[in-house]
């Protein structure tokens, strides 16, 4: 497993913990986008990218995609699509992730946050906004799972046990 797909196990766990609700992907990738295209045909996928090199167009009616120049352009469209069961946050530039996580907080049941061990992403200033937080520290870069929903937190715990994935729990305020 290379450094670009260390989020795959946590993402799979999130999809099991929150089934059948639409997924949001911020930052398409060589590994995450094909995985989500395979797993989200029944639930729907909204995927946004700002780099033409990584952008993949829609694969069907169940998938909506946008290539944006600036991340701020996505907000009217992303919010018009409704709420999301899972969001993968793995886009560039680094500090944009914290801005978008804070804005998505009330629209997503479970966040999958890549690169949680690194200060360059600005997570320290916002991670306390989520009551339940875990990190998959079994591979670098780390991937976090963040939620404010008690039922989702319980589902994450059960899915982690079932999958054999060891998660490090952080105490949050929510």
List each model region and its residues.
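A short alpha-helical cap/connector motif
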Residues: 1-88, 92-174
């Amino acid at each position: 497993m290379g450094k670009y797909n260390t989020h795959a196990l946590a993402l799979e766990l999130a999809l099991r913990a929150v089934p059948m609700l639409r997924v949001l992907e911020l930052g398409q990738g060589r590994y995450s986008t094909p995985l989500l295209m395979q797993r989200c045909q029944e639930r729907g996928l909204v995927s946004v990218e700002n780099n033409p090199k990584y952008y993949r167009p829609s694969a069907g009616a169940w998938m909506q995609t946008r290539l944006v120049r600036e991340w701020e352009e996505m907000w009217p469209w992303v919010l018009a699509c409704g709420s999301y069961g899972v969001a993968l946050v793995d886009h560039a530039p680094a500090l944009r992730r914290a801005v978008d996580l804070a804005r998505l907080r009330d629209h997503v049941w479970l966040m999958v946050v890549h690169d949680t061990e690194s200060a360059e992403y600005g997570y320290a200033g916002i991670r306390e906004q989520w009551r339940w937080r875990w990190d998959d520290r079994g591979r670098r870069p780390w991937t976090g799972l963040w939620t404010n929903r008690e039922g989702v937190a319980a589902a994450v715990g059960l899915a982690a046990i079932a999958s054999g994935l060891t998660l490090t729990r952080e105490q949050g305020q929510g």
